[in-house]
A protein has these predicted regions:
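Acidic/polar-rich alpha-helix caps and helix-coil junctions
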Residues: 1-74, 78-215
Length: 215
């Protein structure tokens, strides 16, 4: 396509976004079908340069203002906090040992020109895990979930990898808890957290706010 946007894979992006919103709509079989159409080796990114800079880096990472990483829990309650050694924590956060705040934003927001994924390929795997769990296909759900939990950074197009031992969750509730936990970690700062909290019925006490306070 002559006027293609640099960094954008149109077909995979359309199928990925279709899968996302079918899941949100409770259309689980259709969500699985759409997710299966996405090539997990391909990437789509919003690209930035010295003139058009990464907006999160410019407004938050570089200023430690607006919002900021607080600690290594990534906003999760203790029962769902990242497992020790989860490689995604080091991907999404960095540590400043000399100047407060100690925890800093990293990942896709660590420089003015860092590209931001339109979607992460692993989101498709988590969509399938959730959809299978919500339709009581627990074996398939656990298989998809463990693809994300055991994935190494080198096996991921964006170098996001937990590299942990597989989950042994055996009930729908336990698997869905693991799906929620891993969505929060794997897709950190992707803008999907509030929708996920609502869909998974998380307590409102876990939220800092329901809406960002724009006038």
């Amino acid at each position: 396509v002559a006027d293609a946007v640099p960094g954008m894979d149109y077909v995979n992006t359309l199928n990925a976004l279709k899968a996302r919103y079918l899941l949100f709509s409770g259309k689980y079989a259709e969500a699985i079908t759409a997710a299966n159409l996405v090539d997990l080796t391909k990437k789509s990114t919003f690209n930035y340069d010295a003139v058009s800079t990464n907006p999160v880096f410019t407004t938050a990472t570089a200023t430690n203002n607006v919002f900021q990483v607080i600690d290594s829990t990534l906003g999760l309650p203790a029962a769902l906090a990242p497992t020790a050694g989860d490689g995604r924590v080091a991907f999404y956060t960095s540590i400043n040992t000399t100047v407060a705040p100690r925890f800093r934003i990293n990942g896709f927001f660590n420089a003015t020109t860092t590209g931001v994924p339109v979607y992460l390929p692993s989101e498709m795997t988590l969509i399938k895990a959730e959809a299978y769990a919500r339709t009581n296909n627990l074996s398939a759900a656990l298989t998809e979930l463990n693809k994300v939990i055991t994935k190494t950074a080198s096996a991921d197009p964006f170098k996001v990898g937990a590299n942990l031992a597989a989950s042994t969750a055996s009930t729908a509730t336990a698997i869905l808890d693991e799906v929620y936990k891993n969505r929060c970690i794997e897709l950190y700062m992707s803008g999907l957290k509030l929708e996920d909290m609502r869909r998974f019925g998380r307590a409102t006490t876990e939220r800092k706010r329901n809406f960002f306070p724009y006038p």
